UniProtKB/Swiss-Prot annotation:
Gene that this polypeptide is encoded by: dxr
Record-listed 1-deoxy-D-xylulose 5-phosphate binding positions: K128, S154, E155, S184, H207, S220, N225, K226, E229
Keyword terms of this UniProt record: Isoprene biosynthesis, Manganese, Metal-binding, NADP, Oxidoreductase
Cofactor: Mg(2+); Mn(2+)
Organism phylogeny: Bacteria, Pseudomonadati, Pseudomonadota, Gammaproteobacteria, Pseudomonadales
One GO term of the biological process aspect: isopentenyl diphosphate biosynthetic process, methylerythritol 4-phosphate pathway involved in terpenoid biosynthetic process
Name the record gives this protein: 1-deoxy-D-xylulose 5-phosphate reductoisomerase
Keyword set includes Repeat: no
Chain sites annotated for binding NADPH: T13, G14, S15, I16, N127, E129, G213
Domain of life: Bacteria
Catalysed reactions, as listed in the record: 2-C-methyl-D-erythritol 4-phosphate + NADP(+) = 1-deoxy-D-xylulose 5-phosphate + NADPH + H(+)
GO molecular function: 1-deoxy-D-xylulose-5-phosphate reductoisomerase activity; manganese ion binding; NADPH binding
NCBIfam families: Dxr, PRK05447.1-1, PRK12464.1
Amino acid sequence: MSGPQQISILGATGSIGLSTLDVVARHPALYQVFALTGFSRLDELLALCIRHTPQYAVVPDQVVARKLQDDLAAAGLDTRVLVGEGGLCEVAADPRVDAVMAAIVGAAGLRPTLAAVEAGKKVLLANKEALVMSGALFMQAVRQNGAVLLPIDSEHNAIFQCLPGDFARGLGAVGVRRIMLTASGGPFRETPLEQLHNVTPEQACAHPVWSMGRKISVDSATMMNKGLELIEACWLFDARPDQVEVVIHPQSVIHSLVDYVDGSVLAQLGNPDMRTPIANALAWPARVDSGVAPLDLFRIGQLDFQAPDEERFPCLRLARQAAEAGGSAPAMLNAANEVAVAAFLDGRIRYLEIAGIIEEVLDHEPVTAVEGLEAVFAADAKARLLAGQWFERHGR
């Protein structure tokens, strides 16, 4: 490869996108921004375009596109503005692109991420919903198109680093007994259960360790985030649900562990900063400076672990059940969760009603086989419809 790698960043204005740009900016000889995309923080997208001078920017609609195009021209940039899902897929699959950071949150990220996979790109996967929803279809596309899939979630990136390079032969074949996903436990790990009824969106978004967007912060509080990561781990590493264990580790220093049959346990440690897994995936199989401070074990002093309480975190139980059921269940779980979390953030439901809505959706609809992408989106739409009916029945 000659010259810097060309990078498309899908979801550039989110926390993962901004962290990616921070790492990229540290290595101008290695990486160049090809495209930036944004959905809502469009003034910030303009500022990022001015700083990083991409060839393309992608926004949700034509009205916004015209304004951004005018603003870019006024700034002396010839960045071309594309629109909608078609624009996202175009910059993900462009032949000039070497790597795609897939950091769009939620189901909206599936098609463009799949477009990058089908184009055989190096895909840095931060959009866990893509794998949760489409699982077998997604991994089949990775294999068929020769894409390189590198996980960005700190936990899956840690597992990737702790596994041997030939883990695709099968976990049993390389001597792995189980995978241990660590979780901080979120802001309500020790909150008395009776107080959870009155949790506000602001409290749920105040994560004690990580800096994240609002939706993923709520998912972390309910531990649905860890449930989605459990499903993602099953697909990434060809693991059965019973081979993936969740461990609460409040310090978030150990990002995950791999337990081998000979009694060895390998762990990846580091300060809780998403630039570490981003730099690891960008440079893989090499390593580059991420800008993250070295880990000071003497300052940390102590590492704690505990089992998750399913009464406190029912979403984790629901996610494991969906993983075991397979088929349409994970897509429905994800869709119902997206609807419920959005309603909680809008003040329409209470925190503890999130899990109830998801469980009602999953209980209502039998699990069906998922033979193609249309079936994935049909399951997603059905779950959103059922969740919407919950609001109608409860006058919300």
